[in-house]
Amino acid sequence: MGRNSLCLLGGTFDRFHIGHEHLLTTCLEQSDEVQVWLIGDEIAQRKNPLVLSWEVRNDEISAWAEGAGFSERISLHLLKDKVGPAPTSKEADAIGCTLETLPTCEVINSRRQHAGLSPLNIIQVDHVSGSDGEIVSSSRIRAGEIGRDGCHWLGGAEMHIDQRMPAMLNDELKQPYGTLYEGPESNPSVAMSKALAIIGDESPKLIAVGDVCVHTLVDMNEIPDLAFVDGMTKREDWPSAADLDRTVFTSLSICTSPPGVITADLKLTTKLALSNSEPTLVVVNGEEDLAPLIVHLLAPLGCAVVYGQPGKGVVLRITTEETKENCRRLLDVFTREV
């Protein structure tokens, strides 16, 4: 088969990753030019509200194409339906796909033949596997499992080791990691109400860390999807911790994690709790102060994590790829416990 003149590609291309790179590169190896038809925001965000905007997705592909030296051979277009120009294009002679989208390409070719047009050469491209051997996909990235390079943010053998925080991180981790919403310490619902007003309906989970935060949310009848408590506040026993109505949580888990340590027990318990569809309470024997670090690394993108900042209010941080990158940077400094 000779080289193709113009290859068509269609899709969402959310969180442009190594699988997308492989798909585009393969089509470019067999074609002079490639038209990428990006699904518009209305359709894409109906599929998943966490899909990035068309403009951002367009810019990410453009930046990759420029860096790879393909700018002159790739053009980007808005796709408003499932098939775009493929059934009627007289310029295109090829179409790229993966195994899942192969049936759509076959339907397109059938429509072309009925219209008296030549069928498109189908370039079927294999998926790329991540570090765990599973397919790299935008959905797994949005689920918070892997980064765009196909590597787990936290997984494998690291899930089964204890890690101690070095003293050099003390000052950094004392600072609010997120947006601080201030309010009187005597009435934490004031600060919490400000934080809740910011969280969008599309957030997959509301996650609370700390007895005061969890107690406040329950009192406000805003039951978190996942909550961590250790019976203390300001590193002292908190008598009111016993008053928490645990019956609002469908599932209860208990783990151990001493102060300054992230244990395998905490990691595995957090991962399991995040998979629960019902409200889950995690009781930490020890200290839950470092739980947000693990939560952000394991949680789906878009999750809202709240914790208390003593004497100041409530800190809210949304789990994003940037959040995961920073938490990964911090955990890389932790030392392994023997």
Please tell me what each predicted stretch does:
Residues M1-S193, I199-E202, D211-M220, G231-M232, ...:
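Nucleotidyltransferase catalytic core that binds NTPs
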Residues E91, E222-P224, L301:
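Glycine-enriched alpha-helix->loop->beta-strand junction motifs that scaffold or abut catalytic
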Residues T101, E288, H296, V305-P310:
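Short alpha-helices
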Residues D149, P300-C303:
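Short helix-capping/linker segments at secondary-structure and domain boundaries
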Residues L196-A197, L217-V218, I294-L297, A304-V305:
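A generic local secondary-structure boundary/capping motif
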Residues P204-I207, D225-F228, L252-S253, P279-V283, ...:
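Structural motif
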Residues V212-C213, V218-P279:
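Acidic/Gly/His-enriched mid-domain segments of enzyme catalytic cores or analogous surface patches
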Residues A264, V284-L301:
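Long, charge-patterned amphipathic alpha-helical coiled-coil/hairpin "stalk" segments used as oligomerization
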